[in-house]
Amino acid sequence: MGAVLRSLLACSFCVLLRAAPLLLYANRRDLRLVDATNGKENATIVVGGLEDAAAVDFVFSHGLIYWSDVSEEAIKRTEFNKTESVQNVVVSGLLSPDGLACDWLGEKLYWTDSETNRIEVSNLDGSLRKVLFWQELDQPRAIALDPSSGFMYWTDWGEVPKIERAGMDGSSRFIIINSEIYWPNGLTLDYEEQKLYWADAKLNFIHKSNLDGTNRQAVVKGSLPHPFALTLFEDILYWTDWSTHSILACNKYTGEGLREIHSDIFSPMDIHAFSQQRQPNATNPCGIDNGGCSHLCLMSPVKPFYQCACPTGVKLLENGKTCKDGATELLLLARRTDLRRISLDTPDFTDIVLQLEDIRHAIAIDYDPVEGYIYWTDDEVRAIRRSFIDGSGSQFVVTAQIAHPDGIAVDWVARNLYWTDTGTDRIEVTRLNGTMRKILISEDLEEPRAIVLDPMVGYMYWTDWGEIPKIERAALDGSDRVVLVNTSLGWPNGLALDYDEGKIYWGDAKTDKIEVMNTDGTGRRVLVEDKIPHIFGFTLLGDYVYWTDWQRRSIERVHKRSAEREVIIDQLPDLMGLKATNVHRVIGSNPCAEENGGCSHLCLYRPQGLRCACPIGFELISDMKTCIVPEAFLLFSRRADIRRISLETNNNNVAIPLTGVKEASALDFDVTDNRIYWTDISLKTISRAFMNGSALEHVVEFGLDYPEGMAVDWLGKNLYWADTGTNRIEVSKLDGQHRQVLVWKDLDSPRALALDPAEGFMYWTEWGGKPKIDRAAMDGSERTTLVPNVGRANGLTIDYAKRRLYWTDLDTNLIESSNMLGLNREVIADDLPHPFGLTQYQDYIYWTDWSRRSIERANKTSGQNRTIIQGHLDYVMDILVFHSSRQSGWNECASSNGHCSHLCLAVPVGGFVCGCPAHYSLNADNRTCSAPTTFLLFSQKSAINRMVIDEQQSPDIILPIHSLRNVRAIDYDPLDKQLYWIDSRQNMIRKAQEDGSQGFTVVVSSVPSQNLEIQPYDLSIDIYSRYIYWTCEATNVINVTRLDGRSVGVVLKGEQDRPRAVVVNPEKGYMYFTNLQERSPKIERAALDGTEREVLFFSGLSKPIALALDSRLGKLFWADSDLRRIESSDLSGANRIVLEDSNILQPVGLTVFENWLYWIDKQQQMIEKIDMTGREGRTKVQARIAQLSDIHAVKELNLQEYRQHPCAQDNGGCSHICLVKGDGTTRCSCPMHLVLLQDELSCGEPPTCSPQQFTCFTGEIDCIPVAWRCDGFTECEDHSDELNCPVCSESQFQCASGQCIDGALRCNGDANCQDKSDEKNCEVLCLIDQFRCANGQCIGKHKKCDHNVDCSDKSDELDCYPTEEPAPQATNTVGSVIGVIVTIFVSGTVYFICQRMLCPRMKGDGETMTNDYVVHGPASVPLGYVPHPSSLSGSLPGMSRGKSMISSLSIMGGSSGPPYDRAHVTGASSSSSSSTKGTYFPAILNPPPSPATERSHYTMEFGYSSNSPSTHRSYSYRPYSYRHFAPPTTPCSTDVCDSDYAPSRRMTSVATAKGYTSDLNYDSEPVPPPPTPRSQYLSAEENYESCPPSPYTERSYSHHLYPPPPSPCTDSS
């Protein structure tokens, strides 16, 4: 490229001789040079591979070419004589740099930005950037410079189009053209003639004037389609035209000689005459020593013809030459994906983007004036970060255990960092480098947000926008907490301190006020309460309070005394927190400033003085300054929390920061993993977390009642627990997986539990009728009673060194001990008021006493040396010592889990055995396990249980399936091993694996497209076709749905039907269902497609509520809840007998399992069974099971038999329903809304015949006229048009063909029957004044021979003599017309005969129709049936599967209209993208003049982009914007939507603010955070459906990510 440019540069020196320049122009994808004298030749590409080059200019003397790229939001340059030398000049803070101009004398770069509405200047390398103009600009575009005079010129095509002039230093601004101007695009200067030229793309002219705007003249007008950019060389004007895609030229004086220079340009943009002549030399006042300026020296039109200037935001000193060393006061701004700084020293308030990467969701921001770091929180990255004020030195400060950090505050004195977390509901502190972290407050916080510090006094203040909004204060160590304000608050988002006046200010986004009070909570008053719809970020500096507003997308400030307001920045979306600060000034001090107050870790200042504090896991020793890691400490649970106490320092107890603890009971730990485990008898869970409170999770959530005892197997990594309510001892892995019941027989209220994994034993206490202490191997075997004569023993603990057991006795108030066999029993301590928990460490035992509310210690052998460790503790439930010595030893399970696939359980003999999850069986290898294949499932209201009939197994367990609300019915797919159930609360059908994984909604609760709400009642699975048959209580139909959730359709529906219980027999192709019709309940059978319907029983029934089927024995069973009995019959309905009718109260479910019939009795809370062979009678299976709802037996699937079923492979080839016929072959069928096509495999839409047509049942002829129905001729191939023809009524005449006509039409002279039989055998006598036609018809005599045919047989015009002159001979035209008429008549007659008689019989086999249909089953139109035309096409039962897609037989059986609607039979589907419904194209004021480019102006694909350098905006060059459109959406704000806004995916109308559309469409990115009330990350995990205390926006951590709601809450649809 360099060689080409050098040659072109050399050629340019020939310009003076040739009087024609090289033209440099931007072509969007490249920059090109073309010879103006030979423009027809190809242009030379100067720079290629560009995104969207718009403006271009050059500095000829330096060999530099500059251009702006609006897609990359950058200004770049290249050098003539270097290859691939593209350099970035300006890459930040640009949005749409439309205009560009080079000052070749002062060596400066000027540009316009039509998005930011600024004109800026910088050095040629992009340094020392300064905003010259930022006010009264509205779409500035072209810019031209006259350095010799110090003036600059630019066009503005905004609402008030104009051309302005100003000094190049920003002075002497003046409008020179503001009339007869609309879209001023191109602009150029004639330096020799001192003229200004411009092009207007709307008014289609090129005008010129003097440089001051006077003496305006037209150069070219009327013949310019769309001029864009303009340049001049000598006497010739050159310009680009968007419409013609060319470069044109004319004489600059007269406009004559208009010609095309260069054509076929992809997208001609800016243009310049590339010549030294266009950049004449002149005196440069800045040429010597930069004019004495420290930074920028700008040309000026007034003496001394230059002006010193400073970069944006920096003040010029009084000497007029030197700039300050950066800004003094800054406003730091956090946006969603970038950070910005705004200087408060200068009036332009230009926002400068910090060059930082990977900002995902910045929220809060603060500043440390000592080291110059900015600190901010990122909600998506879940981290706290920092960088220097220029964006360099970026670091992550805190990354662990961060959920939603909404507030941040720097203690610049003690060098600490504080933050609030509304996810963990904590206030924490750490050093500024992220070390030495400590939780200060974790209780009674709902939604903490803003936080500010007063290090001089020692207080911190924060807001909480929870259910009871408040502003609180505490010392910097978290002590002395007090509520300052808790009334008349909504969403207190922002908080700021006035250190000088002792005031605290806050902004409330719900009450829309800014208020102030004294720091002690007194003197509250309102400062601002007008036009602040959604305040968020908040700060104070000097006399001003600053805030961000989400809805107004603005930053404003108000004077704290006068309340005068000023807008700092406007229309900037995604605004979050902000901080106003003095960059270098540090105020105040406290004792922590000197050597960290002498503290080894944290120095926290309080009003009473400093306090040294330790991070989590450390403890303060007696000097109260030094923190150490303790060797051992006590852990204890106290119902609402879990705490720790050092054994070395006897310091105060410290709560472990755990959320959601309701009633902690048993407690243990895993020392190698540094985790604690605890049971919660209120939540009925077992949970775990790290010692610092992080990573809290529930490991066991199902099937617990009162888990009072729990212990960790630290060698096998297993968890054991004893449940007093279920009377079981269970085990699982530490994460809750592979759960198994070890002991369940003869357990009576098991309580305390202790493990000895090294020896393979477990020990427990029982509190039942005969309290005792038992022992068993850790697999539950070898059970024995060690201590039989004991009271309610608790706190069971083991001294592993001395091999002794210790326990407290709640009945005798003793602490006792024995050896590991229960012998050598001793009393260690007596005279104890109420001992409860107990543990042992080294030479001491530690116990809790409920009466003394204390933790005490004594010698473990003598009970002497009693000491109170801690007092004032209520109801300490459990206690233990956290130390490695308490978890020592080894067994084989400690190595690779003993090579067991699931559980490794230590035993005393043999070392270990492999164990399996409940109901699994150990394989022959004694290592691996197999899942059960035969079992029972039964459901309760909010649980599904599995039961096996095995004496060696615990009978039932609860399956770990989440979110069960109201289980009504269950079924199981043995092939995929998935469980299906109906949730009657959510009205849906769901499925999941037995372990709760792979949850999926199969049938949703509504069908929006059909406006249907459903209520599934019962379900049954066809495992061969992979279908679910289910009844619906709302629509009273039987539906079929594929197991993957795709609908098949309705197979059974009737006007009086109320199908409820259903069971399928796919082996025979039938289904059985109860039909609870009013006054006549029935049990019916039908084929799986709903045909062959048959009532089996209609008598002796009251409310048959449950069905079961035994295909092996060929038996059907049902339970009648009203008659309270269970009956059976053959599958055909024969041999009906009553199986059981005694002591049955409320049977709700039946199933067959082997030779037994099982049922559940909801009222008796019982599962029972009866032997179907009659040999063993009735047996109770299990009792005391509340809220039973259904039961289902799962039998082992024989894969060989399964594969032999004809429907098992690809559904038998059927597209929809596969049925087995009696001979073992298959028959395909369809749901009711479809019919079977000719291939007898596929289902399709039935023919959409009009209401005036009859639908043939099958065959290639679909529709015939209704009049042909029952006319005696068979037009349909299957003769269905002549089947079941009605008998005529008494008032009708029946034609010979069977057709019925009105009796009055008989013998009226007109043949009304198709066979004319109504006019046969008629005896007619005409009156005297009448003429009798040959067919017997009577007409008036005056109508005889009147040249009008009145008799239907035309006999009235026969035998007539002429009475008039003969008509003239017909012309050829008349003859032609007659010929055409005759031809049409003959053709019609032939067509009629063919259609009626011949064609239907002659159609060949090879012909095809659109759809071919085959219907199985007889036509069954009753005699006497007279079809309505609107129902003829779809109501014939012989076509019971016939219905259009939009017919009344919807998938859920709803009724919405006639079976066939011709209006809907069009080529566009309901989802057609061509539909324009709802599309709104707003009126455009001053619309864009550009031609239709690649981008639709209505889709607005371009848009606002964050200015982060890491962001790439891919919109194309946007020449003109739409004006007067609504601003971009913002998170749902206040006022309009405080109560009932719901998030919507709808986008506002196309009328969005220019450039902001991309903010509405960032589907792949999260929407701006709330941090505002009631966002989706509410720490209470509540689900608010209305517009919350805050924009219901961003916290979409599950899922899906929606754009923020419009603001205010409008519906733009």
Curated annotation (Swiss-Prot):
This protein's record includes keyword Cell membrane: yes
Record domain EGF-like: where: 282-324, 588-628, 889-930, 1203-1244
Tissue/organ expression: Widely coexpressed with LRP5 during embryogenesis and in adult tissues.
Record note on what altering residue 1487 to C does: No change in the phosphorylation state of PPPSP motif A. Greatly reduced Wnt/beta-catenin signaling
List of residues that carry Phosphothreonine: 1479, 1493
Glycan attachment sites: 42, 81, 281, 433, 486, 692, 859, 865, 926, 1039
Motif (PPPSP motif B): 1527-1534
Ranges where the LDL-receptor class A domain occurs: 1248-1286, 1287-1323, 1325-1361
Classification via Pfam families: FXa_inhibition (PF14670), Ldl_recept_a (PF00057), Ldl_recept_b (PF00058)
Post-translational modification: Dual phosphorylation of cytoplasmic PPPSP motifs sequentially by GSK3 and CK1 is required for AXIN1-binding, and subsequent stabilization and activation of beta-catenin via preventing GSK3-mediated phosphorylation of beta-catenin. Phosphorylated, in vitro, by GRK5/6 within and outside the PPPSP motifs. Phosphorylation at Ser-1490 by CDK14 during G2/M phase leads to regulation of the Wnt signaling pathway during the cell cycle. Phosphorylation by GSK3B is induced by RPSO1 binding and inhibited by DKK1. Phosphorylated, in vitro, by casein kinase I on Thr-1479. Undergoes gamma-secretase-dependent regulated intramembrane proteolysis (RIP). The extracellular domain is first released by shedding, and then, through the action of gamma-secretase, the intracellular domain (ICD) is released into the cytoplasm where it is free to bind to GSK3B and to activate canonical Wnt signaling.
Effect of residue 1415 to F: Found in a patient with congenital hydrocephalus; uncertain significance
Lipidation (S-palmitoyl cysteine): 1394, 1399
Stated consequence of mutating residue 1399 to A: Some reduction of palmitoylation, and little change in plasma membrane location in the presence of MESD nor in Wnt-signaling activity
Intervals, Cytoplasmic compartment: 1394-1613
Extracellular side: 20-1370
Outcome, altering residue 1590 to A: Abolishes Wnt/beta-catenin signaling
Ranges spanned by the short sequence motif PPPSP motif E, renumbered to the chain: 1603-1610
Residue numbers of Phosphoserine PTMs: 1420, 1430, 1490
Effect after changing residue 1491 to A: Greatly reduced phosphorylation of PPPSP motif A. Greatly reduced Wnt/beta-catenin signaling
Chain spans, region Beta-propeller 4: 933-1202
Predominant cellular place of this UniProt entry's protein: membrane
GO cellular component: cell surface; cytoplasmic vesicle; early endosome membrane; endoplasmic reticulum; extracellular region; membrane raft; neuronal cell body; plasma membrane
Family label: Belongs to the LDLR family.
Oligomer status and interactors: Homodimer; disulfide-linked. Forms phosphorylated oligomer aggregates on Wnt-signaling. Forms a WNT-signaling complex formed of a WNT protein, a FZD protein and LRP5 or LRP6. Interacts (via the extracellular domain) with WNT1; the interaction is enhanced by prior formation of the Wnt/Fzd complex. Interacts (via the beta-propeller regions 3 and 4) with WNT3A. Interacts (via the beta-propeller regions 1 and 2) with WNT9B. Interacts with FZD5; the interaction forms a coreceptor complex for Wnt signaling and is inhibited by DKK1 and DRAXIN.
Function in brief: Component of the Wnt-Fzd-LRP5-LRP6 complex that triggers beta-catenin signaling through inducing aggregation of receptor-ligand complexes into ribosome-sized signalosomes. Cell-surface coreceptor of Wnt/beta-catenin signaling, which plays a pivotal role in bone formation. The Wnt-induced Fzd/LRP6 coreceptor complex recruits DVL1 polymers to the plasma membrane which, in turn, recruits the AXIN1/GSK3B-complex to the cell surface promoting the formation of signalosomes and inhibiting AXIN1/GSK3-mediated phosphorylation and destruction of beta-catenin.
Protein known as: Low-density lipoprotein receptor-related protein 6
Species annotation: Homo sapiens
Source organism phylogeny: Eukaryota, Metazoa, Chordata, Craniata, Vertebrata
